[in-house]
């Protein structure tokens, strides 16, 4: 199912709002949407909400044989799925261009940046290593999928615990969580993607674009960075040309946003760990606020209405008057008038239908009698079967008879007179029969 395209009015409205440095949800140009992180009952399961965009992250592991060229390193695998539950435009089981681009960007952001120590995932060199699989499911799409997916992936990896193992000779022993505590992954840093949307060929910039803003943007710049201000990857799409100063400015903004998001992630991990140690309630069910009626509500957007009247007066004063202004009504026909800029009014003349309506309102209900028409070939007298002239009234139920002239009007006259005499003779015979019967 294809997505519903934006109308021209919506597109112009969005672009006009961006030019005035306003956004539909009330944010400023460099503001991020609210980020909410909730953890499941198992380690390595989390849901990240970036506004209305929701991504579910799940990490799993298994012992496999290593790659031939990297015998002492573990394997990282990332998989992002776009289901129709998130948006009707996504087709299940099909590798779209958007899905391929997002998966490659996640691999460059997390795997190529060496954020996880893959050598610590080795159990037996050349024989057994841990394969870490990160599955990401998009639950709801409201724009900026890559930022929400990168946050969900790194949060799930930080929250994940793998089973402990021991090696004695050639025997590898795998312990359950009851026998030994699971072991967390060795993470060097936390790279996070920050997206920048450009409009009007790079003139205007927005951070964290939503779904509607992504439809009207000209290009997208994604910068993956950690809290140490180290750029892990950078990608530009959309075919726009960016200046060096624009890229530097975006990198500075990304550094500030990444530091804030990293602090939020660390606090969420610490709170979850504290609740688990204290034996409190945790999981997705506990993170839903079910005691509030307005748990799911639209955030209010403040609007400044202080200078609306002054602005309206300025617009009226700056507006240019039309070239020709008519201050008095222009009489086109009797009973009509027009006040405007002097353009000829095509509605000035009364039409036939309006004349008929006026005659009906005035009480003129006289019948229209068709007179004998005079043709070039001769005169034709239109007489009915009983010698009475044909009368057309205003009633819509009666049939209308259209008389067409013939080539020989004298023959038509003779035929009509013969038809009139014939029924008169028949009527006389009927009267005689009635008298004899009596």
Curated annotation (Swiss-Prot):
Summarize the subunit comment: Component of the RNA exosome core complex (Exo-9), composed of EXOSC1, EXOSC2, EXOSC3, EXOSC4, EXOSC5, EXOSC6, EXOSC7, EXOSC8 and EXOSC9; within the complex interacts with EXOSC3, EXOSC4, EXOSC5 and DIS3. The catalytically inactive RNA exosome core complex (Exo-9) associates with the catalytic subunit EXOSC10/RRP6. Exo-9 may associate with DIS3 to form the nucleolar exosome complex, or DIS3L to form the cytoplasmic exosome complex.
Looking at the keywords, is Nucleus present? yes
Protein name as it appears in the record: Exosome complex component RRP45
Q: At which residues is N6-acetyllysine found?
A: 297
Alphabetically sorted, this entry's keywords are: Acetylation, Cytoplasm, Exosome, Isopeptide bond, Nucleus, Phosphoprotein, RNA-binding, rRNA processing, Ubl conjugation
In this UniProt entry, the residues modified to Phosphoserine are 65, 306, 346, 393, 395
Task: Say where the cross-link Glycyl lysine isopeptide (Lys-Gly) (interchain with G-Cter in SUMO2) occurs.
Answer: 297
Q: Where does the record place Acidic residues bias?
A: 349-364
Record localization: Cytoplasm; Nucleus, Nucleolus; Nucleus; Nucleus, Nucleoplasm
Q: Which family does it belong to?
A: Belongs to the RNase PH family.
Q: Which PANTHER family match?
A: EXOSOME COMPLEX COMPONENT RRP45, EXOSOME COMPLEX EXONUCLEASE RIBOSOMAL RNA PROCESSING PROTEIN
- Which superkingdom is the protein from? Eukaryota
Presence of keyword Flavoprotein: no
Offer an example of a GO molecular function term for this protein. Answer: mRNA 3'-UTR AU-rich region binding
Q: What role does this protein play?
A: Non-catalytic component of the RNA exosome complex which has 3'->5' exoribonuclease activity and participates in a multitude of cellular RNA processing and degradation events. In the nucleus, the RNA exosome complex is involved in proper maturation of stable RNA species such as rRNA, snRNA and snoRNA, in the elimination of RNA processing by-products and non-coding 'pervasive' transcripts, such as antisense RNA species and promoter-upstream transcripts (PROMPTs), and of mRNAs with processing defects, thereby limiting or excluding their export to the cytoplasm.
Any one GO CC term of the record = nucleolus
Q: Give the residue ranges for region: Disordered.
A: 337-365, 377-438
Organism source for this protein? Mus musculus (Mouse)
